[in-house]
């Protein structure tokens, strides 16, 4: 598929009910229980016995739901606001996305604590593999028929399932930790790779295979990431990605932080994305609260998000070129990032992790003189990108190392849940800023960069062009910044506007309670996805009518991107794997959360 014959993507229509009509016609309306939410999509509960055939139908329906966007679970046992919903101790939900419809649907199945099992759907969507492993790891829900149901985030020796409500959320609730020599040896043995466990043979007809650990401390692994390679010489026969070394329990943390105090934690998901991480979270919370932010807030948020798209892509560009052997450009890209951080720091007060967006607005207004800082950067960067393109990206060695390497097409990308530049490099014109505009992106003029071959070179070139488009967006923000407040005038805006606290005791009380205890969000569910630096990032929030989230599901783009690796790299050389890893653009914090 090329940019010329890319799929037609219709205008986005929230809560599109067409699929509900199709499902009712095929299975009968009695097969579904509709749940009203603020997720912007139909949410349907089904019986476990009919789950597989319903999902199969959605996978094969005309204009199919080609992507399993997300799959995870909820411990419902302590949830009090469940009126009208099927009885459940646990829930497994399936979030499906159709590019051709430009719409989503969520299917839920209720489970009792005494029978925690649901059939695997790895035969329908291959990327269900890791998601089902994570649900088993976090909740203890079984998936009969899964090819290798094992821990994925937690160590193999871990006891318990962390996202259950009865599992401790704080280290102080555990006994003091000690690592004896015997336990250390046990952990090392548990991490030993056994090919037979993964259906691999130690030898072929005429050769013995070598098994090589790449990582978890290899410079080309881009973080604490391990890939076990089955090699015939330098050819990769098969491989097994091993993740979880960077897992910090971000979703568990969200259950014990207020809606307001969780904002800094979002910065640490994709730690190169800065305020881009804040955006889907605060937008989702604002849906729960019913907050509509002023136009100025939207424009400020877009401008700063695009600044972080540029800083993230500059780091990608330098490390990508370094991965294929050129050592100098990475020093230039890091230096150039500092110019962006000078602007970011002047506006937000921080550099990498500003935690600057707020529920209902941003932390403070733009400082005096911000326009000159932004204009200087906007005028300067395009010439630098021209230099990178001429000096490095047109280099014959780099092109020889990356053109035609680790290529996949649109169909394969959708099956594995690939989004962002990885999807658009195949010719699929799907960018949420255009396909499903949020925060006012529909008011800006910019192009969606596309390529055709879906290889390691195209993925890089798409990101370079994305930086040019980000500059265009930032320039429009600078020239058209509206007047007005930087926070919404709403009771759940957190913190409330400071000025009134000096005049009204009621506002002062609200300010104190919302900052210390957190705002009380109405019981409901909300969802927001955005076009983040590495692909589509989203927050699916469940409120039980309290000051903290009942369940926070963070779907990151890098997680499915790493799961796809074996399907793309088999039959290639180890050197090609290094180029492929560099072209994915991932950080392990985004994968492991």
Curated annotation (Swiss-Prot):
Annotated spans, NADH dehydrogenase I subunit C: 1-184
Alphabetical keyword list: Cell inner membrane, Cell membrane, Membrane, Multifunctional enzyme, NAD, Quinone, Translocase, Transport, Ubiquinone
Renumbered residue ranges of the record's region NADH dehydrogenase I subunit D: 208-593
UniProt name for this protein: NADH-quinone oxidoreductase subunit C/D
Entry-linked SUPFAM superfamilies: HydB/Nqo4-like (SSF56762), Nqo5-like (SSF143243)
Main subcellular location: membrane
Enzyme Commission number(s): 7.1.1.-
Catalysed reaction equations from the record: a quinone + NADH + 5 H(+)(in) = a quinol + NAD(+) + 4 H(+)(out)
Domain of life: Bacteria
GO cellular component, one term: NADH dehydrogenase complex
Family: In the N-terminal section; belongs to the complex I 30 kDa subunit family. In the C-terminal section; belongs to the complex I 49 kDa subunit family.
Subunit comment: NDH-1 is composed of 13 different subunits. Subunits NuoB, CD, E, F, and G constitute the peripheral sector of the complex.
Entry function: NDH-1 shuttles electrons from NADH, via FMN and iron-sulfur (Fe-S) centers, to quinones in the respiratory chain. The immediate electron acceptor for the enzyme in this species is believed to be ubiquinone. Couples the redox reaction to proton translocation (for every two electrons transferred, four hydrogen ions are translocated across the cytoplasmic membrane), and thus conserves the redox energy in a proton gradient.
Topology in membrane: Peripheral membrane protein
NCBIfam families: NuoC_fam, NuoD, PRK06075.1, PRK11742.1
Disulfide bonds: none
GO MF, one annotated term: NADH:ubiquinone reductase (non-electrogenic) activity
Compartments where located: Cell inner membrane
InterPro entries the record matches: NADH_DH_suC (IPR010218), NADH_DH_suCD (IPR023062), NADH_Q_OxRdtase_suD (IPR001135), NADH_quin_OxRdtase_su_C/D-like (IPR037232), NADH_UbQ_OxRdtase_30kDa_su (IPR001268), NADH_UbQ_OxRdtase_49kDa_CS (IPR014029), NDH1_su_D/H (IPR022885), NiFe-Hase_large (IPR029014)
């Amino acid at each position: 598929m090329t940019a010329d014959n890319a799929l037609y993507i219709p205008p986005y229509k929230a809560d599109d009910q067409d699929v509900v009509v199709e499902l009712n016609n095929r299975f009968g309306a009695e097969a579904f229980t509709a749940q009203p939410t603020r997720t912007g999509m139909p949410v349907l509960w089904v019986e476990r016995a009919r789950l597989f055939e319903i999902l199969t139908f959605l996978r094969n329906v005309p204009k199919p739901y080609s992507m399993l966007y997300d799959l995870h679970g909820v411990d419902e046992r302590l949830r009090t606001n469940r009126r009208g919903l099927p009885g459940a101790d646990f829930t497994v939900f399936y979030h499906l996305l159709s590019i051709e419809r430009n719409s989503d649907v969520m299917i839920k199945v209720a489970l009792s604590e005494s029978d925690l099992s649901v059939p695997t759907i790895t035969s329908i969507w291959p990327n269900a593999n890791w998601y089902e492993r994570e649900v088993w790891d976090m909740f203890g829900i079984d998936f009969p028929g899964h090819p290798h149901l094992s821990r994925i985030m937690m160590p193999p020796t871990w006891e318990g399932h962390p996202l259950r409500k009865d599992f401790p959320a704080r280290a102080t609730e555990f006994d003091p930790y000690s690592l004896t020599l015997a336990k250390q040896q046990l952990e090392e043995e548990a991490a030993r790779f056994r090919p037979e466990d993964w259906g691999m043979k130690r030898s072929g007809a005429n050769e013995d295979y070598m098994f090589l650990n790449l990582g978890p401390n290899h410079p080309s692994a881009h973080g604490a990431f391990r890939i076990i390679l089955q090699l015939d010489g330098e050819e990769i026969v098969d491989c097994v990605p091993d993740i979880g070394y960077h897992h910090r329990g971000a979703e568990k943390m969200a259950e014990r932080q207020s809606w307001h105090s969780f904002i800094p934690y979002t910065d640490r998901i994709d730690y190169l994305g800065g305020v881009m991480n804040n955006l889907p979270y605060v937008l989702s919370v604002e849906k729960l609260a019913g907050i509509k932010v002023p136009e100025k807030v939207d424009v400020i948020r877009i401008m700063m998000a695009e600044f972080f798209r540029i800083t993230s892509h500059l780091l990608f560009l330098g490390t990508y070129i370094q991965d294929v052997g050129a050592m100098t450009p990475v020093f230039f890209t890091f230096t150039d990032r500092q110019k962006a951080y000078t602007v970011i720091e002047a506006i937000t007060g921080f550099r990498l992790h500003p935690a600057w967006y707020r529920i209902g607005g941003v932390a403070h207004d733009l400082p005096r003189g911000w326009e000159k800082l932004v204009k200087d950067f906007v005028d300067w960067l395009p010439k630098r990108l021209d230099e990178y393109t001429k000096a490095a990206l047109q280099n014959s060695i780099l092109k020889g190392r990356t053109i035609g390497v680790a290529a996949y097409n649109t169909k394969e990308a959708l099956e594995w849940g690939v989004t962002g530049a990885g999807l658009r490099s195949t010719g699929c014109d799907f960018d949420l800023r255009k396909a499903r505009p949020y925060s006012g992106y529909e008011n800006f003029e910019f192009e969606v960069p596309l390529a055709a071959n879906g290889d390691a070179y195209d993925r890089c070139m798409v990101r370079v062009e994305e930086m040019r488009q980000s500059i265009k967006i930032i320039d429009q923000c600078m020239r058209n910044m509206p007047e007005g407040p930087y926070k919404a005038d709403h009771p759940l805006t957190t913190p409330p506007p400071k000025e009134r606290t000096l005049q009204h005791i009621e506002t002062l009380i609200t300010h104190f309670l919302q900052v210390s205890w957190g705002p009380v969000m109405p019981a409901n569910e909300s969802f927001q996805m955005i076009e983040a630096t590495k692909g589509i990032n989203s927050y699916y929030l469940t409120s039980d009518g309290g000051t903290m989230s009942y369940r926070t599901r963070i779907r990151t783009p890098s997680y499915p991107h790493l799961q796809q690796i074996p399907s793309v790299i088999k039959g290639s050389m180890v050197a090609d794997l290094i180029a492929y890893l560099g072209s994915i653009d991932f950080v392990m914090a985004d994968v492991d959360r």
